[in-house]
Amino acid sequence: MIKNYFKIAWRNLIKNKAFSIINIAGLAIGLACFLLIALYVMDELSYDRYNTNAERIYRVDANVKFGGNELNLAVSSDPMGATLKKDYPQVEEYTRVYGSSGSKLIKKGAEFIDEERVCNADSTFFNVFTLPAIAGDTKTALNEPNTVVITESTAKKYFGTADAMGKIVEADKTPYKITAVIKDMPHNSHFHFDFIFSMDNVDYQFGNYLSMNFHTYILLKKGTDYKSFEKNFTQVIGTRDKTEHSIIGDSIIHFPGFA
């Protein structure tokens, strides 16, 4: 019986060739569009999900008010992270990223390469974010000044091999020791760094709540209601720096063009 159904269907297709071609082409285009949209949505929703603790990682943003105008900034002040960890038991860890929109001149042989995918980060960076190491211990890699963590492709680019542990790179005429090599950052991440330098090498004298220079991330303890936490800390911190702060969950927000 099924065989007869196929025969009838085939005869109808042959009988109405033009109509059949239009229908089949339309169906194929519709399916292709559906698959492309589905893949795009899945990719967007996967941003930063590679982090083991993605559901508990948040970025501290500042809503700065100047007169009647309000500015939403993806940065916060120098002491923000340390203050939150000290004053709020809900905060398990924090880390700061500095200079993500800058660049450094990296020496390679006799030439200098202007690298834009660079930043400075606290030693706690790898306690918050999951970036697998190929060599070295990322938990301690940025504990000292003049240290840097690089990606696998960067190691091969500068040294011809991923085995770059202990080697020296010169950035802006300052030597840095490579203390860890990590896998290249996934495409579905709002981080796109090739060099992560120690925060100890950042020459800043800010130390107040009005200097918005850092991207601050916090790792909340399991079971924390971040909405109530955000409301509480906004009231307290806002009295110190005259701004309103908010936390953005980096497990669910895609930050385009951050780095």
Question: What is each stretch, according to the model?
Answer:
Residues 1-31:
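N-terminal Sec/SRP start-transfer signal
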Residues 119-134, 146-259:
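Mid-to-C-terminal secondary-structure elements
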Residues 26, 59, 215-217:
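Short aromatic/hydrophobic contact patches that present stacked aromatics
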Residues 29-58:
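Alpha-helical transmembrane segments
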Residues 58-62, 77-134, 240-241:
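Short amphipathic beta-strand/extended segments in non-transmembrane regions
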